[in-house]
């Protein structure tokens, strides 16, 4: 038997792939609870089992509670920490980071803040240094996202799995994803979901 772990997001767009998926696989293991009912309505004979999201295994409820309260001395600090998560790919950082820096500038004009950018590797770190204006007081950290989320008061993040981590740590988050006008126009015609941030999709509400 051929088992698929993690369903393609055909519930968002390209539902036409459903027939091919049900032909290619004998079982779908889903990481999002709503996917099982989505498949059952459109392909009742295709077996789908919800097995939970891998992120849940990384964080315990006890750790989450401790991180956001007792272990976070900066939670009510006079200098809140704004965490920027522009993405992991070069194109994402090139498009998202300038927008995030503009947002930070607006916030900094109103209150004193600390700003931290978390990036996945040294290559993206070097790219970010070219984008950040000279003299800007911003820290850049490679990896250790969980530690950064423990102390963040606000996150500005690119859409993706990272938004689930922000939700898990209960950090208020602004989600963005900047693309070309052509891609946006095509996506607007094809995408069938109301929200693009995964926490909002799961909650069926505007959490972020």
What are the residue ranges of the model-derived segments?
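Nucleotide-activated sugar donor-binding and catalytic core shared by glycosyltransferases
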Residues: 1-208
């Amino acid at each position: 038997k051929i088992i698929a772990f993690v369903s393609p997001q055909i519930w968002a767009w390209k539902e036409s792939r459903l027939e091919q998926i049900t032909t290619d696989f004998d079982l779908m293991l889903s990481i999002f609870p709503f996917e099982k009912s989505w498949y059952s309505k459109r392909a009742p004979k295709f077996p789908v089992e919800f097995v939970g999201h891998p992120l849940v295994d990384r964080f315990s409820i006890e750790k989450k509670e401790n991180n956001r309260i007792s272990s976070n001395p900066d939670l009510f600090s006079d200098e809140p920490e704004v965490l920027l998560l522009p993405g992991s790919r070069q194109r994402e950082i090139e498009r998202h980071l300038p927008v995030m820096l503009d947002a930070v500038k607006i916030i900094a004009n109103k209150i004193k803040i600390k700003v931290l950018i978390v990036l996945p590797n040294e290559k993206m770190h070097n790219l970010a240094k070219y984008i950040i204006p000279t003299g800007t007081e911003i820290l850049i950290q490679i990896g250790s996202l969980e530690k950064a989320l423990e102390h963040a008061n606000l996150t500005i993040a690119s859409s993706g799995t990272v938004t689930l981590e922000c939700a898990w740590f209960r950090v208020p988050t602004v989600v963005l994803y900047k693309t070309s006008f052509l891609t946006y126009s095509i996506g607007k015609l094809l995408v069938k979901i109301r929200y693009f941030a995964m926490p909002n999709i799961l909650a069926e509400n505007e959490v972020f």
